[in-house]
Amino acid sequence: MTQVFQKVSAIRGMNDVLPGPSARWEKFEEIVRGWLRSYGYRNVRTPVLEHTRLFARGIGEVTDIVEKEMYTFTDALNGDSLTMRPEMTAGIVRASIEHNMLYDRPHRVYAIGPVFRHERPQRGRYRQFHQIDVEALGFAGPDVDAEMIVMLARLWKLLGLQDVRLELNSLGQPAERAAHRAALIEHLERHQDVLDEDGRRRMYSNPLRVLDTKNPAMQEMADSAPRLFDFLGEASRSHFDGLCQRLADAGIEYRLNPRLVRGLDYYNLTVFEWVTDRLGAQGTVCGGGRYDGLVELLGGKPTPAVGFAIGMERLLDLWEQSVEIEQPAECEVYIVHQGEEGQRLAARVGEQLRDAGLDVIVHAGAAGFKAQFKRADASGARIAVILGGDEVASRTASIKHLRGPVGADAAQQQVPLAQLADVLKSKG
């Protein structure tokens, strides 16, 4: 007896993108890539799998990502610990060091692709999701920090988004954070009675992250904690003031959020998030900041750097709420045909039209004209090319507008096959 195969579904939190939504993804990526090119950013592609120690070192041992959220396994061939990337910055920095990219000049680079985190799936939070990761490697001043924020404001405008807000903070330099850390630990020790289990566990290993709590019982304690901003030295304040001045020059409003720390340990000086109220609890659309010590931490020479990451699923959700996105057609031209000779001719004509730069579907199989026209209309094609018995005999094609022109311009016309491509292209 043959055993019935149990149907396989996608892993929870890892979603399929089907042809309709995929077309919107392609349109979205087209806008994003054009926007990035306009600022001089070039594409890089790094592996989905990296050595686990890259993320443990780069992101931080005592972070939610490293402690709880990474997909990690042991390579059966050599025993290496490997991890599916939970973010892209560490991999891009690793690549820049390995390939000596930073030897003689800075680089503006970006990557678009999937990342993986073992989280509880919900709207805006998935186990496989996609990021747009943008990095400026080798740039030290607040001018590049400001440019990144300004370019994001431009993207929101390109996408027609109105209600995305900027939150800003400075994490200073290591010595300033050390002084703040000591004061913060004292504060946490005085309020141990309100700390939850996670807060008590992190009190000494990562006290700054204790303030980034969603626990209502800890909010008053977090609000009264020493502010890192008060520990900043002259150079850090100057960098932040320079950033704020440039944002004012660009007319970009922001809210200073002293509790904004981000979930990755490599940040220093500038950190920022763009947030919205329209995505529920997962309201952060984009986050980033400066990470001047990461290249050296991962074995490279001291190199200033700044970057950000955008969650594509969240931004797509927001975009689709904000504007009406037209469903792209499957093709420009749909060829219908009659008889075996018509079908064979249609295949040749389809290739000729593609040579001319047109997107063409040739109806597959044999069917009556009514069924073929129904499928042609469903494809979204502007024009149907008809190769019936008369057309095959006279080496012509009939052109029928399915959508677009009206009146005389929409009348069906018959043209010689040799002129078909030119006539179709003239119809836009």
From Swiss-Prot:
Q: Name one GO molecular function term.
A: histidine-tRNA ligase activity
Report the Gene3D superfamilies cross-referenced here.
Anticodon-binding domain (3.40.50.800), Bira Bifunctional Protein, Domain 2 (3.30.930.10)
Q: Where in the cell is it found?
A: Cytoplasm
List, alphabetically, the InterPro entries matched.
Answer: aa-tRNA-synth_II (IPR006195), aa-tRNA-synth_II/BPL/LPL (IPR045864), Anticodon-bd (IPR004154), Anticodon-bd_dom_sf (IPR036621), His-tRNA-ligase (IPR015807), HisRS-like_core (IPR041715), HisRS/HisZ (IPR004516), HisRS_anticodon (IPR033656)
Per the similarity annotation, which family is this?
Belongs to the class-II aminoacyl-tRNA synthetase family.
Reaction(s) the record says it catalyses: tRNA(His) + L-histidine + ATP = L-histidyl-tRNA(His) + AMP + diphosphate + H(+)
For this UniProt record, the keywords arranged alphabetically read as follows:
Aminoacyl-tRNA synthetase, ATP-binding, Cytoplasm, Ligase, Nucleotide-binding, Protein biosynthesis
Top-level EC class as recorded in UniProt: ligase
Biological process terms in GO annotation: histidyl-tRNA aminoacylation
Protein name (Swiss-Prot/TrEMBL): Histidine--tRNA ligase
**GO cellular component terms, A-Z:** cytoplasm
Q: What is its EC number?
A: 6.1.1.21
Instruction: List each coiled-coil range.
Output: none
Q: What is the annotated quaternary arrangement, including any partners?
A: Homodimer.
